[in-house]
């Protein structure tokens, strides 16, 4: 993938950039792997806003991704690399020997025609999926499970990868995540070899507000320009200070620097080294 710089034909396009989609080999998705989805605009079942600054956006179909990779011992051929509007990574269309089709996250270096496998005794090759206990130390991995059989939850964004540092015992392995956090993960969990593709996604510049609206984002208004009944920073004559010793969230809680990690969380015992540890 390469980054396209647009000509400054307007102020909105002056610093805009995008992908050339050179890796994409198929433009129309597999119909049997599509699910319709409706946008909720950040509302819950009661109609209350639970996530601010969401709404609108282009209509999208959800691509059903195989995060479990549990068809062991069966070869799957990569038939296409496709764009997925629901995530930053590209996806790969697989055709299994028994005729089943599925999507997986497209790892860096995976090409059309390659064969990928899942199972215990598969090769340490990009795109293959196996249990962490069968992966050598130092291997780059992605698409990592946290609970056996639940499906991958970690290292799924474009360009992201983790590294398997070692095996402490038969039950746990030590993995260094992209954030720098080092944590223990059950050795029975599966992971996929390699890093997620589309690694230059982070270099794309949105360029203009309208392009963000296409993605389903609405404007973010500063609290200091609101009324005092809408935000703790609001009110005052003209451009006034926030009136608090620390910045506040819209709900009156300290923010911008306040620690939000619960050190009594059950997952704390699995963290060997925090991401902000010096």
Swiss-Prot record:
Keywords: Ribonucleoprotein, Ribosomal protein, RNA-binding, rRNA-binding. It comes from the Bacteria. Residues 223-278 are annotated as: Disordered. GO terms for biological process: cytoplasmic translation. One of its GO terms (cellular component) is large ribosomal subunit. Coiled coil: none annotated. The keyword Ion transport does not apply. SMART domains: Ribosomal_L2 (SM01383), Ribosomal_L2_C (SM01382). GO terms for molecular function: rRNA binding; structural constituent of ribosome; transferase activity. Residues 255-264 have a biased composition (Basic residues). The keyword Ribonucleoprotein applies. InterPro entries: NA-bd_OB-fold, Rib_uL2_dom2, Ribosomal_uL2, Ribosomal_uL2_bac/org-type, Ribosomal_uL2_C, Ribosomal_uL2_CS, Ribosomal_uL2_dom3, Ribosomal_uL2_RNA-bd_dom. PANTHER family: LARGE RIBOSOMAL SUBUNIT PROTEIN UL2M, RIBOSOMAL PROTEIN L2. One of the primary rRNA binding proteins. Required for association of the 30S and 50S subunits to form the 70S ribosome, for tRNA binding and peptide bond formation. It has been suggested to have peptidyltransferase activity; this is somewhat controversial. Makes several contacts with the 16S rRNA in the 70S ribosome. Belongs to the universal ribosomal protein uL2 family. NCBIfam families: rplB_bact. This is Large ribosomal subunit protein uL2. The gene is rplB.
């Amino acid at each position: 993938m390469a980054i396209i710089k647009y000509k400054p034909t307007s102020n909105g396009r002056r610093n805009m950039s995008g992908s050339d989609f050179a890796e994409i080999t198929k433009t129309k998705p597999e119909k049997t792997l599509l699910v319709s989805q409706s946008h909720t605009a950040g509302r819950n079942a009661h109609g209350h806003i639970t996530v601010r600054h969401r709404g609108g956006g282009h209509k999208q179909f959800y691509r059903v991704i195989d995060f479990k990779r549990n068809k062991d011992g069966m070869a799957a051929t990569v038939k296409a690399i496709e764009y997925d509007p629901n995530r930053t990574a590209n996806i790969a269309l697989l055709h299994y020997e028994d005729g089943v089709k599925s999507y997986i996250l497209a790892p860096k270096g995976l090409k059309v025609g390659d064969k990928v496998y899942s199972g215990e005794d598969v090769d340490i090759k990009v795109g293959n999926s196996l249990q962490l206990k069968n992966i050598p130390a130092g291997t780059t991995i992605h698409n990592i499970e946290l609970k056996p059989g639940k499906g991958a939850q970690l290292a799924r964004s474009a360009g992201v990868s983790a590294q398997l540092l070692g095996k402490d015992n038969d039950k746990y392995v030590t993995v260094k995540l992209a954030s720098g956090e080092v944590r223990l993960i059950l050795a029975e969990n599966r992971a996929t070899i390699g890093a997620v593709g589309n690694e230059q996604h982070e270099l794309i510049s949105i360029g203009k507000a309208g392009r963000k609206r296409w993605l389903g984002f609405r404007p973010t208004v500063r609290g200091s320009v609101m009324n005092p009944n809408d935000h703790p920073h609001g009110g005052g004559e003209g451009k006034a200070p926030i009136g608090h010793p620390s910045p506040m969230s819209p709900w009156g809680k300290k923010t911008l620097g306040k620690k939000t990690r619960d050190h009594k969380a059950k997952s704390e015992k699995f963290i060997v080294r925090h991401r902000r540890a010096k």
